[in-house]
Amino acid sequence: LCNDLSNLLNRTISMVNKYFNGKVPKYNGTPNEVDKELEKYTIEQIEKFEDLMEEYEISNALQEIWNIITRTNKYIDVTAPWILAKQEETEKLESVIYHLVENLRKIAILIRPFMNETSNNILRQLGIELKEKNVWQTLKENNKQEEIKVIEKGEPIFMRLNMQEEIEYIKGKMG
């Protein structure tokens, strides 16, 4: 959780602040191939998630969410937003940042039934309010929200554990 989801959120918020002064770029409707691939993959995983939930295969459904998280982290590495910024490829950079925020919005909605507080925390940090009565309907489309402003400094949604402290704590409880 800490390495994947929390890191994805913090990296995204950091880039929105660094490259766009905290304002999420609007969707321009013309994604490049890498963006299209991410969109397609995300929708496929959401559909698998829905099918698995209907069959009460909760752990497998949760794995589909983590597949989206993993793929979105990989998307950062593939698109290299820091290079796009350095090369002043603003339109591509806007699309990358938009897609990162959009996938985090979808992830927050997907984890909501299992981790409601974490979902709310992610959405709050992204500056997103869920106004729709049925947010599930927005999962398979790009949400064209008006201006979104993220918080200035991302907050960890999960804290790293100190293994030695945890071992000592457990030993102390065991007597």
Model region roles, listed by residue range:
Residues D51, E55-E57, W66-G175:
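Basic, alpha-helical terminal appendages of large translation-related enzymes
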